[in-house]
Every structure is written in C-alpha cells, then in structure tokens.
Amino acid sequence: MSNLTLGSLFDGSGGFPLAGMMAGITPIWASEIEPFPIRVTTKRIPHMKHYGDISKMNGGKIEPVDIITFGSPCQNLSLAGKREGLNGEKSSMFFEAIRVIKEMRESTNGEYPRWIVWENVPGAMSSSKGQDFRTVLEEICKIKDETVHIPMPEKKWTTAGEIVGNDYSVAYRILDAQYFGVPQRRRRIFLVADFAGECAGKVLFEIGRAHV
C-alpha cells in the first residue's frame, strides 16, 4: 500500500503522525485541545490541520483518511488513578473517537478509515474487572459489525489476542518501549483494526515478535 493518509485523535504532541511520516504515511489532520502540544505539532508538521475539541468534530465533515489513530485519555483506566473506568469523565472520551470513526465510515460508504490504531495503558485490561477492555473490543468490532458480541475471558485478558470476523479483524498486544529504542520501560496496549480484511494481526504481530 502507498500514499496512505492519517488522522490523529487525542493527538498530544503528534507521536502517531510523526511515526506515520517515518513510515511514508501522510498526516492530514489532528484533534487536540492543549495549546502547547498544538504549537509543537504546528511547528513540526506544518501541513497538518488541527480540529481542536473532538466532541465538536463531525467525522462525516472532515477529510476522509485511511488510518485513524487515538490514544484516548487513560486517567480513569490507569492503576495509578481512582479507576472509574470508561465511565470516568476523561476515559469516557473513548466513545467520542468511536463516534467520529463511525461518522466518517457512514459518509464514505464504509471506505474510510480502513484502519484504526488505539493505544492505552495496560490497566485498561483489568479496569472494571476486565469489562472495560471487553467494551473497547466490542465497540471497535461494532464499527464494522453491529451484531457482534465479545464475551469475557474465563480468567483475565491475555497480553495479546486477535479477533477475525466477516471481512474485518482486530488484534491487540502489550508492547514495551524499551525494546524499540527508548531508554525506559513503558508498557502500553496497542490495538490495530482492519475493517476491510484480515490483516490486523499481520500488522501488529510482525513487529517485535520476540518481545510481548
């Protein structure tokens, strides 16, 4: 694939757009509300548009992109917080991202985005006794298949997994930054969804295969 485009929700200082550029992907727009990170990305990626508050965005009225990335707020999912989960004021913003993605797909007859990438803290897997991560998986699968139901695991969520449906796939795993050139231990969940095929696992599991 070539000439892929990217939109970044909860953009922060532009980590996903910068990584995309390093892989030959063109960032088109971002959503962020904090002034300083916006200044950083405006200087670093001047061609990328900024749409501000995600709650005021309509995914059907912005430029369609191949990939939407989002590291939705983790404060209510983190082991360091009060753990209100997806019902918390900040982490419930996850559902705003789902809304924007659905709006874009509806306006493009399901063509865009084909891919999404979600990033969050490992605590998301245990928040609300694992129910929050089940909700994350189910809401993402429902972008393509409204009838899907994701069951809870018998014990707890594993550090990696894959769902393959009818012409879509979702894969997730925990990655540690220390194995990717960063001098610190920083474990995060990464989830890839492919809404037009079974390539999510191929994308996610081919990188750093030895380090889960």
Regions found by a protein language model. Give the residues of each.
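Extreme N-terminal starter segment of soluble prokaryotic enzymes
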Residues: 2-6
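Class I SAM-dependent methyltransferase "Motif I" SAM/SAH-binding loop
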Residues: 8-14
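Short beta-strand element of Class I
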Residues: 27-28
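Conserved SAM/SAH-binding beta-strand->alpha-helix loop
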Residues: 34-35
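Conserved SAM-binding loop
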Residues: 41-42
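Conserved SAM-binding strand-loop segment of SAM-dependent methyltransferases
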Residues: 47-53
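Class I S-adenosyl-L-methionine
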Residues: 57-65, 79-209
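N-terminal Rossmann-like NAD(P) cofactor-binding module of classical short-chain dehydrogenase/reductase
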Residues: 67-69
